[in-house]
Design a protein with these regions (language model features):
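Ser/Thr-rich, low-complexity intrinsically disordered terminal regions
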Residues: 2-10, 19-172
Length: 172
């Protein structure tokens, strides 16, 4: 009986440590947990996907493409400038003719690598969009890390003077 109680105590400790690490991982990414589509949907997404991609009409406002008033070539230069300012980001390939680049983000503690593809896409009306796709190389759930990469690059673009407009969802 003592062995069973000790094993149950150990199991409880492992569960508590796991839940604490999970909470710290998600909270450490400073994600907008209470924003639409809500905490439950976000938690489920962060635990079960390792990809974050900007998509028109995304239920996650931070994952909607942003439009800019800069010409596409100037905006692509700002994207490269913004990435250069981000810690642990490295541009590994850049194609000026198509305004696309591939960057690798290396995590601080375990040195995990995430791939981020960024494109500046010209739009009718002259307001190019920045679209992104961030993918973890390891694991099934990224705890929102790739969403954080998208948010970090959009924030860095603001810092270098490229001010974007987020597509607004219509209220129905």
């Amino acid at each position: 009986m003592r062995i069973v109680l000790r094993l149950l105590g150990l199991l409880l400790l492992v569960v508590v440590v796991f839940v604490a690490m999970l909470a710290l991982g998600i909270r450490g990414n400073h994600l907008p947990m209470d924003d639409p589509p809500g905490s439950f949907v976000r938690l489920n997404t962060y635990l079960n996907t390792h990809v974050a991609e900007t998509i028109e009409g995304s239920p996650f406002p931070e994952l909607r493409p942003r439009s800019y008033t800069l010409p596409a070539d100037a905006l692509f230069a700002k994207v490269k400038e913004a990435i250069a300012r981000l810690p642990r980001w490295e541009i590994v390939e850049s194609k000026d003719d198509t305004r696309q680049l591939h960057a690798v983000v290396t995590s601080g503690l375990f040195r995990f690598k995430d791939d981020v593809t960024v494109s500046v896409v010209p739009q009718p009306g002259g307001k190019p969009q920045v679209t992104m796709r961030a993918v973890s190389r390891v694991g099934k759930g990224d705890l929102g890390t790739n969403t954080r990469h998208v948010m970090d690059l959009y924030d860095a673009l603001e810092q270098v003077g490229a001010h974007g407009e987020v597509e607004r969802m219509s209220s129905r």
